Amino acid sequence: MGEKAKANVLVFSFPIQGHINPLLQFSKRLLSKNVNVTFLTTSSTHNSILRRAITGGATALPLSFVPIDDGFEEDHPSTDTSPDYFAKFQENVSRSLSELISSMDPKPNAVVYDSCLPYVLDVCRKHPGVAAASFFTQSSTVNATYIHFLRGEFKEFQNDVVLPAMPPLKGNDLPVFLYDNNLCRPLFELISSQFVNVDDIDFFLVNSFDELEVEVLQWMKNQWPVKNIGPMIPSMYLDKRLAGDKDYGINLFNAQVNECLDWLDSKPPGSVIYVSFGSLAVLKDDQMIEVAAGLKQTGHNFLWVVRETETKKLPSNYIEDICDKGLIVNWSPQLQVLAHKSIGCFMTHCGWNSTLEALSLGVALIGMPAYSDQPTNAKFIEDVWKVGVRVKADQNGFVPKEEIVRCVGEVMEDMSEKGKEIRKNARRLMEFAREALSDGGNSDKNIDEFVAKIVR
């Protein structure tokens, strides 16, 4: 007979891969602390998630998956950003979640919810004794930048933006939706909504680690009960305390695992450029052609993730032309790839999950940000953490092939002083990431403290 669970927690993710992964990892950490966890997914993604649950991954955990009715069919486009969609989503999710909590006996001790679902706080308040823990899937730096902007503390982007506990930020260092919030108004409003009730939440959890953002974290802590609990990547790449935790456990894309790993096995250590711009980014046709030309011109081996919907943008006969110097796949097992000894650097869109994965595995970075928080992450990669370089785009946002060649040379060149410094800094942050979630590490202690506070 096992020890009685300390608490019961609902964990509710926004229904996209980049948000599901860190919240699922947090669920595993709670399970390891003897907390019962029910993972909530919207009804429109529930079945697809379970169909793709990796054998020995999520379905092997003592974890329940429960659908929350969002009012949409499973085949509803995940790219819908219309105001009507978000309004209907909020109404249905709030009702369905409240009904679930009412039906539970005993009631959950807490709901850990994606910060993009701020109305979950209102649901929790209707059920006395249920704590509300908002889980932020972006950095404290990005959180603080949005908060300063929404408070009206800066509006102009022509000159450097100077904010407390941060380096000066140019316009193209800021989250894209701040200086072009008409780019996609509903998404800007969704991201901004994360901060509407931060003064009222019980727990402010951030997927980061203390040594990564020392100054801005302290500024945040002076305002709110902010606790870093990251990096939320599988334990076997960090502290190795969760046996068998080698994968997030759920993947909405089919990775070409054997093809990637077999090809990497055939390459010398540190010789491969890994290229992936994430699950959402879409390159313009001319930019795709330029990236293809730049990678080929570097002379290095490269593994490039090009989603199936994007392959038509590749130059004709490109796959045949690169022969064995390059491998193009529709999706990769990214953690396994980044951990492979043949990887020399990671050319990335600088999404926060990808950034944390690379930092946790000590991989040097080439940043090619596109939207959302990515420019801010790229700024810190190059100028604050000094673990990589950022491509320089022209006034139209276009990156020429020569710039890709330059960046690869700076990072991959063995004799380059800058390259040596980048790799040294990457290894240093890797150690900090591992320490954070090791027994007694800052993030580990913060998770323990969260559990202790919600126990009734």
UniProtKB/Swiss-Prot annotation:
Pfam families linked: UDPGT (PF00201)
GO biological process: auxin metabolic process
Keywords: Glycosyltransferase, Transferase
Enzyme Commission code(s) on record: 2.4.1.-
Binding site for UDP-alpha-D-glucose: 279, 332-334, 349-357, 371-374
Listed SUPFAM superfamilies: UDP-Glycosyltransferase/glycogen phosphorylase
Tissues in which the UniProt entry reports expression: Expressed in leaves.
GO molecular function terms noted in the UniProt entry: indole-3-butyrate beta-glucosyltransferase activity
pH dependence comment: Optimum pH is 7.0.
Signal sequence, start to end: none
InterPro entries found in the cross-reference section: UDP_glucos_trans
Highest rank taxon of the organism: Eukaryota
Recorded GO CC terms: cytosol; peroxisome
Family designation: Belongs to the UDP-glycosyltransferase family.
Function of the protein: Glucosyltransferase that glucosylates jasmonate (JA) and JA derivatives. Also active on indole-3-acetic acid (IAA), 4-coumrate, cinnamate and caffeate.
Alphabetical list of PANTHER family matching this protein: GLUCOSYL/GLUCURONOSYL TRANSFERASES, UDP-GLYCOSYLTRANSFERASE 74D1
Protein name according to UniProt: UDP-glycosyltransferase 74D1
Gene name as annotated: UGT74D1
